[in-house]
Amino acid sequence: MSYEGELGEVSATGVSQAEMRTLTMKSGTVARFVATGSSTRADFGLYRWEMPANTGGATGHFHRTFSESFYVLDGKPSFFDGETWTQAEPGFFLYVPRGGIHGFRNDSPMPATFLILFSPGIAREGYFEALAEIGATGRHMSKADWAELYARFDQVMVEG
């Protein structure tokens, strides 16, 4: 989408880390919502993912309506590219186009931090909020419940 104006506009926004909404998962992983789709005019979403050592994450899955990218800041998390798991190091970047099978976890003995960028900027945080609520309350989820949650947030699970 292009900007059609002639003079530009005052529209830049900034947020401090203290102002960012955070979510702590049952595993201890902290999701920091740096930029949500609602704050970027749905251009993209950017999250900072902070995982404790030896923490599971997302098994193989794909998305039909958005791409996802990962950039490792610290630690050695592992990423699944649809065929193999690779232990990454700081500076590693993974781009996953729509339909690309992927997953992530931190099976290393040290904490790991990475950025997750997705485009367009859908309300992806709702998926992680739901997972955190399920973990915090211990709510039982039937196969049908999981299927509904995955469908609502474009999370198509596969083996891997």
Model-predicted segments: where are they?
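A short glycine-rich, His/Asp/Glu-containing loop-to-beta-strand
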Residues: 20-60, 66-67
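Double-stranded beta-helix
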Residues: 107-160
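Hydrophobic small-molecule pocket/channel-lining residues, especially in calycin-type beta-barrels
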Residues: 55-56, 63, 77, 126, ...
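Short, conserved beta-strand element in jelly-roll/cupin
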Residues: 48-52, 62-79, 117-119
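Basic/polar N-terminal segments that are highly enriched at the extreme N-terminus
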Residues: 1-21, 158-160
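Short acidic-glycine-tyrosine-enriched beta hairpin
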Residues: 83-101
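A generic "binding-loop/recognition-motif" signal
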Residues: 65, 84, 100-101, 110, ...
